[in-house]
């Protein structure tokens, strides 16, 4: 029997441990650290670190955070003369503690409004609300929050302005006013316009026109957020790439702000994130209640790989890629457009295990290094 020298065994053991350690510390934020931020949306429970395992995963994989809900007006400004910063303070402190990029979401949005805002009937009252709301919140976190969604989802699918309490009271000037107020409150913070489906031609053109008009009126717009609530088969990579080019041509930073990919049936051809669209469910509409078949896992992994290849191609134009949730179990897509379905749109399953899609995104970088 051939004897193996002890020092060779020692060297082999060291090499094995080294390789294992290298594999163990690989994470999304580490492998993409020279390309763009990798972020996630945090729920209230995650901000308060209620689940240590989830918290550990967040800190390991992500270097940017967005508040999923707690900065929307119904939560942060629940009464005319009352702000509630209990959770927003914890959110910002969490990001600072973990040295993360902190994104504020959102200042002006037609949905999830505080009920008292129904009292606002005229332009004077609306201007007063916007000044108070934007100035108070942005000033409070001046120098601590890195970027803001100033206006969210102001457009219809054809690129025209969406009807809202803001448009009704002030006309389209509310858009420029919002960006001006945010810039006055914190001149150094990056200001974004954020929307869904704005990689599609008509809405893309509407987004470009909106930003041009805001700038012409003296508003500061630093970037555009493409929410990226996508499907396995749409939008096309061509549409995404054309959008990156069109927005960056205006000198805008491009962020993919709410990335997830639905795998469930969609006979209504719904796209994006119109939360007012809801339908009745059936077993046929919820085909994977317990587990996702390998065939669909593979399609999801390939879709994510194709998308991230495109992101890497244009990494000089992309500031951040944020997933809308940490794991499948918390995804809003489990309840939209049908409540109670089981969707699988993210990179981690409800048990916090990485999926094939996670590996496909990670390996794009690891194979090159």
Provide a role label for each language-model segment.
Residues 39-44, 150, 179-203, 255-258, ...:
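Aromatic-lined carbohydrate-recognition surfaces of secreted/lumenal glycan-active proteins
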Residues 45-61, 128-137, 203-214, 304-310:
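Short, acidic/polar
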Residues 41-52, 73-86, 155-160, 197-206, ...:
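Acidic-and-aromatic substrate-binding clefts and catalytic sites of carbohydrate-active enzymes
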Residues 64-78, 87-199, 265:
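Substrate-binding cleft and catalytic face of glycoside hydrolase catalytic domains
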Residues 29-33, 52-63, 89-101, 138-142, ...:
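Acidic (Asp/Glu)-rich catalytic clusters
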Residues 119, 140, 149-172, 181, ...:
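Aromatic-rich peripheral "rim/lid" segments of glycoside hydrolase catalytic domains that contact
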Residues 17-18:
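C-terminal motif of bacterial Sec signal peptides marking the signal peptidase cleavage site
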Residues 21-64, 68:
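Boundary/entry segment of secreted carbohydrate-active catalytic domains
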């Amino acid at each position: 029997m051939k004897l193996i020298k002890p020092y060779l065994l020692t060297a082999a053991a060291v090499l094995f441990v080294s390789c294992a350690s290298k594999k163990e510390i690989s994470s999304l934020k580490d492998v993409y650290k020279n390309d763009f931020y990798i972020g996630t949306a945090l729920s209230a429970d995650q901000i308060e670190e209620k689940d240590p395992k989830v918290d550990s995963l967040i800190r390991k994989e992500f270097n940017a955070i967005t508040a999923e809900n707690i900065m929307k007006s119904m939560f942060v400004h629940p009464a005319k003369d009352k702000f509630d910063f209990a959770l927003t303070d914890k959110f910002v402190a969490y990001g600072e503690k973990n040295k993360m990029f902190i994104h504020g979401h959102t200042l002006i949005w037609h949905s999830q409004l505080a009920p008292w805002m129904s009292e606002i009937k005229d332009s004077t009252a609306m201007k007063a609300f916007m000044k108070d709301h934007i100035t108070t919140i942005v000033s409070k976190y001046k120098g601590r929050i890195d970027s803001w969604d100033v206006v969210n989802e102001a457009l219809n699918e054809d690129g025209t302005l969406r009807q809202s309490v803001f448009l009704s009271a002030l006309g389209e000037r509310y858009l420029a006013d919002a960006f001006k107020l945010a810039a006055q409150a914190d001149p150094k913070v990056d200001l974004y316009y954020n929307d869904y489906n704005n990689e599609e031609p008509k809405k893309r053109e509407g987004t470009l026109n909106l930003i041009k008009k805001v700038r012409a009126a003296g508003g500061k717009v630093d970037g555009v957020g493409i929410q990226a609530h996508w499907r396995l088969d749409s939008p096309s990579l061509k549409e995404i790439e054309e959008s990156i080019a069109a927005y960056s041509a205006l000198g805008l930073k491009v962020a993919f702000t709410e990335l997830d990919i639905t795998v469930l049936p969609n006979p209504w051809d719904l796209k994006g994130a119109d939360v007012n669209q809801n339908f009745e469910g059936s077993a046929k509409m919820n085909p994977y209640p317990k587990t996702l078949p390998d065939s669909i896992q593979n399609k999801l992994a390939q879709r994510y790989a194709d998308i991230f290849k495109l992101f890497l191609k244009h990494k000089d134009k992309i500031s951040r890629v944020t997933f809308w949730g940490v794991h499948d179990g918390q995804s809003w897509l489990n309840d939209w457009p049908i409540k109670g379905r089981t969707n699988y749109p993210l990179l981690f399953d409800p048990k916090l295990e990485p999926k094939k899609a996670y590996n496909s995104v990670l390996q794009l970088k690891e194979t090159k290094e």
